[in-house]
């Protein structure tokens, strides 16, 4: 499955979260680290869902850039 991920820069580093997986987010010092950590977090989260016999949520969020 393909989940959209949002990356946000802060004064101290980067945050990332997947809107389709509530409560799942990471913090990192660099964007590269954030990309690696969110990928690992999503995989771990989905694995946990499977282990509990629950259905994996289908991606539903979409993204768009709007020019003003």
Predicted regions and their residues:
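Short, charged, surface-exposed hinge/linker loops at domain edges
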Residues: 1-4, 36-68
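Short aromatic-glycine-(Arg/Gly/Cys) micro-motifs in beta-strand/loop hairpins
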Residues: 7-21
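Proline-rich low-complexity regions
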Residues: 19-22, 57-59
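A short, exposed loop/beta-hairpin motif centered on an aromatic-Gly-Thr core
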Residues: 22-31
